[in-house]
Amino acid sequence: TDDQPGGTPEKWVSTTTWNGLAGRDNGGRSTHFGVGLDGVGQFLPMYEGSVIQCRGAGYKYDKHSVQIEMAGRNYNYMLTGKASPKMVRSIEIITAQTVELVIVLMETYDISIENVIGHYEVEGSGKTDPGNIYFEQYFLPLLKAELNQ
């Protein structure tokens, strides 16, 4: 959810995330994937059995995690009634793509559902995305339903 125009959900794209991250001191290496209305962008190399260490979530997690940025802002709005119809649709599209990506990553790297977490759960990260209400009441149930099919 870095560097996205909050008021224009139809413009939530992974290329905006990449451009925003690329301009930072760490040169865009703070996440493995960006997901937006334009699809999934891979920002760091992935290898069989291992991933490139990234920066961003917190040192304890950076060495052992795959990080995904979802384009947009205020995903909790979808569940609190504050989202416009365009915002809801954008979140639904981005969520569906992210769920597909997470399932592939879970299968490839033997990641359990308990180890799929939001940035807001990382102590000291200072991040609130994608939003605890959204993640716990929408994303995780959708992910679990897809895994059980």
Q: Each predicted region: which residue ranges?
A:
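Short, conserved "active-site rim" segments that organize catalytic pockets and cofactor/ligand binding
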Residues: 1-47
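A short local loop/turn or secondary-structure capping micro-motif enriched for an aromatic residue
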Residues: 49-54, 76
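Glycine-rich anion/phosphate-binding loops
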Residues: 47-48, 92
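Extracellular/periplasmic catalytic domains that process cell-envelope and extracellular macromolecules
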Residues: 24-27, 34-36, 52, 57-63, ...
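Basic/polar, cationic surfaces and motifs that engage anionic cell-wall
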Residues: 73-149
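Residues immediately flanking
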Residues: 1-2, 70, 120
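Short coil-to-beta-strand
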Residues: 59-77
